[in-house]
Amino acid sequence: MQEKMIDILGSETEIPKKIEGWNHTFQLAKPYIKVNGIGIDVGCREGGFAREMENNFTHIHCFDFRNKKNMFEKNVIDMSKFTYHVCGIGDKEGTTFTTSHAVGRIKDRGDVAVPIKTIDSFDLQNVTFIKYDIEGYELKAIQGSEKTIKKYNPVIVVEQNKGNIYAQELLESWGYKCKGIDKIFNQDYIMVKE
């Protein structure tokens, strides 16, 4: 397999920690994931986590409201395994706003328009894994993925920051259980349907 140097944003000390964190989180989730399925990366940024997923799914759909596709293409080995969608993922279709494309946080305020879609609107089949890392928008994104989640019961990695566990609580109400929390960043929860 061809090796590539990963091109991600961050300082010389941050980049190795990010790569270690993505790998650690995916390795925690991997034993629970069914093989030969579709993966979804919500909040894919420049492709660091997606690269960890690359050899484990038949296809991977990646979502980010900031168009970082050029960097993304440099970071994965085989772009034909990916579909890169430039949109935010939320609980309903429409437009919301943020203050800047430089920051990956949808704030529902500001003057930068962000198109929002739901995962359910894509009607993806055989979804076996979803990662949500969208800086506080996880609950809305999961609400917009309800049909997909309830149909396929994918393994879910969800970032939960600053004591906000609403997304985890929603998943638990749907029969999911937390099987682990990454020990690198202590904010990525591995959720598996019981």
Named regions from a protein language model:
Residues 1-194:
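Phosphate/nucleotide-binding beta-alpha loop and adjacent structural elements of enzyme active sites
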